[in-house]
């Protein structure tokens, strides 16, 4: 039986960004199953691929089988969380990045369901006495659009034997400058560190050097190509909701290293996690791909971490 599902996010594809693309993937997968799917978003470019878009908060007063809020601490989501007690339709609040802000804590209290994907999510519910409202909603990627093609090294002139990659934008939490410092101090032989981002509003894009190549890239195809051709993907962020790029790395059979947070901590069996710059430096200097782990990581994504698994979990809430 068809369900009416409303997703809530601050900005929606085709704008670039992790949240924008992740909610698009969830919405389109939900639509493909014969449901009536809308998205409430502060910034969008109109209906997309059959998904209906709106910026009118009055849509919250309509009858929905489920309202799915993608995280908090941003304007549109916070408006829904703040008013969640007054909204008649059931709300699934996907924590994404656990927050102790007043509006997010209100969302924990007032929303009917709380979606968790990481160890940190479940621990946050336990600390706030709402563990019983938690439901598993696995982060996942769309396998139809997550496969990289060869060609990045040739296109961008990468001549070294090895290439380490980190993507996601030049935001303070991504710690790109700090990663460059660790890489330079490690003196990894015959290796280029490639950084990609689509936003440098803070002016913190690192300087280019012989073995460090920071790029401004809007093309998802180029980013996936970089991930596919990388010997190692590095997620050096101080904070992340999950880190979907780790799943993209695993799907493209690329090893990853990540600070022990969010998705990296949750999936530590499939990559290398660290808690200090020294641990990362030592790993880079001695890096050798583990073919067995690469295959296990790929198998895990294909069986447990695709967008169809995410939507399975969401729809299970109201089945």
Which sequence ranges carry the predicted segments?
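A short, active-site helix/loop in glycosyltransferases that binds the activated sugar's phosphate group
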Residues: 111-133, 141-143
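Aromatic "clamp/platform" in nucleotide-sugar-dependent glycosyltransferases that forms part
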Residues: 238
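Short alpha-helical donor nucleotide-sugar binding micro-motif in glycosyltransferases
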Residues: 219, 225-230
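Nucleotide-activated donor-binding/catalytic signature segment of Leloir-type glycosyltransferases, i.e.
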Residues: 203-221
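Glycosyltransferase donor-sugar binding loop
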Residues: 42-45, 167-170, 192-204
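A charged, aromatic-enriched C-terminal amphipathic alpha-helix characteristic of glycosyltransferases
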Residues: 288-318
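Conserved donor-binding/catalytic core segment of Leloir-type glycosyltransferases
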Residues: 8, 157-174, 180-183, 194
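Acidic anion/phosphate-binding donor-loop and adjacent secondary structure
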Residues: 103, 140-155, 204
